[in-house]
Each structure stands twice: as C-alpha cells, then as structure tokens.
C-alpha cells in the first residue's frame, strides 16, 4: 500500500466526528486538520489546496469533519494498487439522520474524486469544489459516510454559506442594476 495522508477540513465551529479521526487513522500516519480559522480562505477549493500542501505524502484522501470512511472503504483503499492518478469514491449521505438512497445525493449519483496524487491534481471551484486530475481516474466501490444536516437550521446555514461565497465571487456588472 502507498502511504496516504488524510486532509480533514473543518469549520471553526464544527465538532469533528470521532469516527472521522478514527477512520483516518486506520489508513494514514499523517492526518492534517485545517479549519477556516487557520487562515482566511475565499472558498473551499483554496482551503482544500492548502490542506493538501501540508500533507507529507503525495497521496491525499480528502475528508470533511462530518464524514468518515466505511470499514469496507478502508479495506478497499488498503488493497488498492494506486495505478491511477486519482480515484472517485461514492458518498452515502445522511440527512436529518436518515440515509439517502435516491435523488442526486444517493451514492450512485454523489461520486467525486477524493483520493488523489497531489502531484497530478489540484482543487478548483468557488462553492462546489472539485479535483482537476492530470491523468486517469479509477473508481472505488464502497462509500464514505457523510452526516450532512441534522437539523433544518443546519441546512439553512449551509445554503447561506453557499450564497455568501457566490456573492463574494460574482463579478459586479452595473448594467444589471437597470435590467
């Protein structure tokens, strides 16, 4: 198995799930936690690129503080041949305490690159960030677990955060004031 670093992104107010750290430590000797109070970041991509830059290994697994690796995913990563530049991983979302198996938030539809070689990739995107990979992308089959929103209030806070990011990154055009 290749050496992997785990980069965990957390807001300054978030509580890191114990499962997040426990699962990260099962695949890595290098766990990096970056909060938005460490530096002022304009967007999530900047924060995730910063976290990857602090990782000591070339292979980086990206987690948010409200995510953890399923035991099946841990085993799959440990047996991986690392022949690709990156790997996409499905995500099983829990919203209001319930797993989501339908819509765009189902594991079949919510699949992204979260395991990547940082020498062959980087994060881009203002709000819904994604990894740009220079090379081929493999697919893992077992999901990481994501506890999105426990309450409606958390859901609304996230929407507000996304709209704030969008507003900060919009190019001002005075013509639209008159249309």
Predicted regions, residues:
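N-proximal low-complexity "stem/linker" segments adjacent to membrane-targeting elements
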Residues: 1-26
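Catalytic-site signature of metal-activated, phosphate-bearing donor transferases
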Residues: 44-53, 59, 63, 70-179
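Receiver (REC) domain switch/active-site residues of two-component response regulators
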Residues: 29
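Short, acidic/glycine-rich phosphate-metal binding loop used to engage nucleotide
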Residues: 37-44
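Acidic helix N-cap motif at the loop->helix transition within catalytic regions
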Residues: 16-19, 37, 72-73
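Conserved beta-strand positions in the Rossmann-like core of class I SAM-dependent methyltransferases
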Residues: 32
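Acidic ATP/Mg2+-coordinating residue in the GHKL
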Residues: 35-36, 64
């Amino acid at each position: 198995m290749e050496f992997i670093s785990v980069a965990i992104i957390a807001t300054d107010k978030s509580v890191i799930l114990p499962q997040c750290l426990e699962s990260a430590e099962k695949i890595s000797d290098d766990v990096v936690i970056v909060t938005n109070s460490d530096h002022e970041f304009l967007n999530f991509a900047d924060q995730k690129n910063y976290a990857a830059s602090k990782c000591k290994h070339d292979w980086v697994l990206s987690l948010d503080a409200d995510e953890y690796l399923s035991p099946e995913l841990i085993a799959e990563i440990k047996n991986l041949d690392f022949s690709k530049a990156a790997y996409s991983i499905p995500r099983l979302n829990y919203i209001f305490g319930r797993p989501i198996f339908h819509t765009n938030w189902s594991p079949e539809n919510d699949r992204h690159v979260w395991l990547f070689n940082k020498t062959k990739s980087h994060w881009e995107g203002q709000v819904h960030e994604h990894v740009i990979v220079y090379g081929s992308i493999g697919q893992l089959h077992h999901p990481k677990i994501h506890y999105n929103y426990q309450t409606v209030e958390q859901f609304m806070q996230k929407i507000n955060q996304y709209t704030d990011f969008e507003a900060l990154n919009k190019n001002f055009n005075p013509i639209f004031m008159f249309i």
